[in-house]
């Protein structure tokens, strides 16, 4: 237990799932007796992704800023609430950025865990080379429940030898079966495991420690929709009518155009109490949850809510078919919870989720994943 572990993940994202999965993995390892720090690394693109306003150097940036002027104060407050959460609940190393030497970042650790979240999704703006630990020697390297999502691996896609970097990891596990297969084929190794997201390793009782008290003092439906998608909003409108309950959603798209769009569907936009601990409260106390998000799904399962996931149409017209969601629903035998919007009225015909069965299955998956991780650290 003298092993000092560094966790490298998307802990600085203004994204509820990202910060809570970082918190969850950290707390699991602390509970097991390890010394743990989240490596406080900021990728090159982070600042530009999350600042309320961009430098007015292009027409696009000017239009972007105009769309945010009416909500700039809300965005700033949300950013501050995320920072407060990190400062309070995340055990951070000192700060590093893309200009830091890798030797300075990693020399203090015996083991580095990359993940979870989409840290190996090379199509994302915040997927930095560092998440593949290039030129990092003499420490154990573990990838835990990394997600590649739709990314196609190619050794030439980055400035590093991607295949060689991944091959040098001592242990690799992926969050989705398809991702594990993709990584196995890429590096020609068959021992890539499938493990569940860190958030799902804990019970609701462990999140109750940080969960805010009830905020909405009425019965309600909670919509967690990352992109203000029309399919999810239409589903919310239909389900609100079926259940005769109001729908609340968090301010995630972070611009006034989306806020107006959401309001047109009769959904109430939450613009205060937006911290990750508040997010937990909105799910915990909801009568029903609608989501298009993997972590919206995960916390619905953790708090044993009745819920549906919306299989949205993309700009191409094709269904999203999010493998992160389909994988966990399949593991728990509740695939019927993933609905197309043209089938949304069938929600009233769904049987209630039997959480005696589902939570037992989730606990077994959690034990298997924890056993894999502890073995990877100790061997």
How should these model regions be labeled?
Residues 1-379:
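Active-site anion-handling motifs in enzyme catalytic cores
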